[in-house]
């Protein structure tokens, strides 16, 4: 039986998922306010999907971090088919507008097992601590910190690490090293085999952690869900 002293969790598609209404509403903002060439809502939603996938893939490939503002500007420019569409767009103001859409249409818990399993895990391993290690794209860490308490995750994590705040993305070992350093600073020395990183991405989460000598468990993108963690304790 493996009993870990610290559980590091990915966030998106591990503990939470996007609100379908959010994807519609964010495209509506761009269509109504940043759409000089009159593209349809469907066209703008399709551009968002492309930029979302591309942005995540680029961050994983380079280990760096594209800023949320850059991604929104890409959407506006690509949808319009011209960089002239960016004239007069203020990136910080644009992000503030888009953050309001997230706050009005917050992410949802991944599934009904998520919060009960985390609570059971805490009861079974009361000495264990939890943290987040999350790549971000259109939604920054500062915005996620605002919405997580409303999802029943308040007080669950000793600390939260987001790629936009760290300037690096999983699987970059620099990001996993930040996890180890933060862990040592908050709970003292801990051996890597006493930590487990849990996520849905075989490259960013599993390979990234294992390259640093940290055990890793894949959930949700395979045939096992978060309840698998209870079978390990």
Language model region names:
Residues 1-9, 17-18, 39-42, 115, ...:
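Asp-based, Mg2+/Mn2+-dependent phosphohydrolase catalytic module
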Residues 2-116, 124-126, 141:
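N-terminal helical cap/lid subdomain that shapes the substrate entry/recognition surface
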């Amino acid at each position: 039986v493996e009993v870990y002293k610290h559980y590091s969790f990915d966030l998106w598609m591990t503990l939470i998922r996007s609100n379908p209404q959010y994807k519609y509403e964010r495209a509506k903002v761009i269509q109504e306010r940043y759409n000089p060439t009159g593209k349809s809502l469907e066209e703008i939603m399709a551009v968002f999907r492309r930029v979302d996938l591309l942005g995540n893939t680029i961050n994983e490939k380079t280990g760096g971090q594209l800023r949320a503002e850059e991604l929104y500007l890409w959407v506006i420019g690509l949808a319009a088919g011209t960089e002239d569409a960016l004239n007069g767009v203020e990136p910080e103001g644009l992000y503030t507008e888009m953050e309001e859409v997230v706050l009005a249409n917050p992410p949802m818990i991944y599934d009904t097992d998520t919060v009960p399993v985390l609570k059971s895990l805490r009861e079974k391993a009361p000495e264990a601590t939890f943290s987040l290690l999350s790549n971000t794209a259109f939604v920054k860490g500062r915005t996620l910190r605002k919405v997580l308490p409303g999802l029943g995750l308040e007080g669950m994590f000793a600390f939260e690490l987001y790629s936009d705040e760290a300037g690096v993305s999983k699987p970059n070992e620099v990001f996993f090293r930040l996890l180890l350093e933060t862990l040592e600073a908050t709970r003292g020395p801990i051996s890597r085999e006493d930590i487990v990183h849990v996520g849905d991405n075989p490259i960013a989460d599993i390979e990234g952690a294992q390259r640093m000598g940290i055990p890793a468990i894949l959930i949700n993108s395979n045939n096992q869900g978060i309840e698998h963690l209870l079978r390990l304790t």
